[in-house]
């Protein structure tokens, strides 16, 4: 059960403010939705041979266009990725308020231009749109800056919500050569607001034959002329949906057949060259951050994943949603026996006072992971493991003066959307926790806890249902070798491969191979204590996070943890760490009677190792060839020219080898989105992260960060 958000804070804008920011496109046209549907059908027909159709939309409006795209998609063998750019972030609560009060989801009569208009029935419900609207609301879009990826129907429909300044959002994305944007819909209230630079950024992201459609151009000849010229100057053909819908029905007022133009067949060569220059500028500016080599086939043996935890399971799932098979190698008898083996793990975002790339990434990642849990729970695979979880919220409190100052900086640093987190006083904290804490805190209403190994197992089961995904248990890969035709995996007795692509997602063993042993990442031991649910303690109703964490009960036990020991010598049970976990709770909430209910006498605990990076970002991307980096460094160091060299030269890497790890203690939040981004890279699809954040995830970043500044390694 999701924790009850602070609803008065959720809807900060009244209805009049909402309709001003998110206006209905054609509320005076009783047939608008029918016209929109006809136009959208023609878009899908024009690109019916593509397995993945990428569409762009400028403006969310009242959401009707988004829902109609979703409803109109009818080809079961085609996937849709719809990228919506909206300057004003909105959350699910405000979106529902907008729909409820505007009656946006109402039935209308079909558009029939040869017949007299019929009166629409304004109060009849549109069940087909209402159902999709509820599905969208259940995904809990939040009012954060950046991209939120929403995946529906086992990957058949994906919606990227890009909130924030449109020019900033467009320019932050890279062109996807294999899967560019094929068509744009621009809502009329944003036509004049788009900067000329935004037009070119749209062109950069588009297929060379991509077109633009909008609504109501013919109603304002001045707007029509200036708008069309702007976009034509970037190589686009611009059409009006009203005219397209009439033409699509075949005959105009004079009885003459009118073809529907949805593909720009003769773009200007000079303008196309200018687009290509923009793309090359991007490539050159981020040459130090090489992308994955795109998979050339979907054969079952094309990709191997080493690891049996959350990272490997979610990579397999993200690949499977794209129809891509994979073979997963796990050294244990069951999945999720490493860092993913805990009974309960907290899921909530890592926030910083500055809301920097780290903070924004973790908000996106946390929300993505939360939606994954919901999707795997609501539409499980056949015989799928159920995922024990409870989105009961996470309550963060301070445990000393220093941590209080840090928490205050976070709370006061940004106007955080209250669906992400909001401050509570001591009385509110007690009410949320259902036990006495008697101190203020920061509450994450959408957070909670998830069972990691069940989460991993459910993801694998779903992946195996969707594509040719296999899992080899009890298979300890001891060495990997690069050969002319791919990567070969070796155990004591067996040999697997070759594989065109190999992903190392093996948690604590991430650095065990020659090709990965130089990664700048450290193992940290963590002992989680399991204590019986009894007396006052059993009433705990949210995850507590202070000096350590404490979960609500699950199957009669609470999880209390965790120790944090760098480069551990062993993974045996440690009585001292057990007592340290208890003392952390006493330091966090001193002199409270419920602390006496924490019974450690059973010495019940689990020990695991999490791999941690210094900057707290996961590692995701091409495996760096560190010896080659160091060799090149001998020739290019500590000069202005050397900085230019490292900036514009693709960094050395191991061809076909990728890293997915370093999830640290927040892998439940960060792992699924990191896996989704790597799957998108491997398949040549748009990635739901901006270019700067991708650089922060790159496994080579520790070396390149210094080299780009002209510093010594």
From Swiss-Prot:
Catalytic activity: 5-aminomethyl-2-thiouridine(34) in tRNA + S-adenosyl-L-methionine = 5-methylaminomethyl-2-thiouridine(34) in tRNA + S-adenosyl-L-homocysteine + H(+)
Positions of the UniProt region annotated as FAD-dependent cmnm(5)s(2)U34 oxidoreductase: 306-713
Database matches in InterPro entries: FAD-dep_OxRdtase, FAD/NAD-bd_sf, SAM-dependent_MTases_sf, tRNA_MAMT_biosynth_bifunc_MnmC, tRNA_S-uridine_synth_MnmC_C
Annotated region described as tRNA (mnm(5)s(2)U34)-methyltransferase, given as residue ranges: 1-300
Presence of the UniProt keyword Cell membrane in the record: no
GO cellular component, as recorded: cytoplasm
EC number: 2.1.1.61, 1.5.-.-
Required co-factors: FAD
Recorded superkingdom: Bacteria
Example GO biological process: tRNA wobble uridine modification
Function: Catalyzes the last two steps in the biosynthesis of 5-methylaminomethyl-2-thiouridine (mnm(5)s(2)U) at the wobble position (U34) in tRNA. Catalyzes the FAD-dependent demodification of cmnm(5)s(2)U34 to nm(5)s(2)U34, followed by the transfer of a methyl group from S-adenosyl-L-methionine to nm(5)s(2)U34, to form mnm(5)s(2)U34.
Family: In the N-terminal section; belongs to the methyltransferase superfamily. tRNA (mnm(5)s(2)U34)-methyltransferase family.
Protein known as: tRNA 5-methylaminomethyl-2-thiouridine biosynthesis bifunctional protein MnmC
Lineage, broadest ranks: Bacteria, Pseudomonadati, Pseudomonadota, Gammaproteobacteria, Alteromonadales
Gene: mnmC
